Amino acid sequence: MFRISPVTGMLYVARPLDAETKSRYTLTVTAVDQANVGMRRQSSARVRVAVIDVNDNDPVFQETEKTIYFDENEPAGTRVMRVNAKDSDSGENGHLSYSIANLNAQEIPFTVDHVTGMIKSKRLIDYETDKREYKLQIRASDWGTPYRRQAEMRLTIKIKDINDNRPQVRHHCTALAFLPGQI
């Protein structure tokens, strides 16, 4: 993993390190002078190496596609579900925020909490007058630098009809004629 220059004493990394695999190393470095064998002196020092994480991992959703059902007529703010992604980077490189990535996000009657990933309804949705299915692209973005890494999942929300409308008689006037003796 490491090498040391015998001339300068400079410590070098021999191959790339990955903070997700191992983030700390403890080395013992020993210097020996060039005196005759019986007169040589040496000194040792313990060197601790902390590997600083870089933003080298994308967030990963537990599921990349999911379909759920949501009852019509639920009030605004009703919880739909929570999406969850993980990022194996550490610190801000692994801290995630969520958003709806659809271009028409303003028209979608759902919102996602940027911190928790909880999806909620923005308004009451009516099966008879609104769309019956919504396709959301949910994005998880890390807070990494120099650039953010992201991943998306597709969430399909199908609206379920509930029994909220009375039956209606289509013909209000009905004339019945009976001849005597038929009843």
Where is each model-derived feature located?
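Extracellular cadherin-type adhesion modules in metazoan precursor proteins
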Residues: 1-183
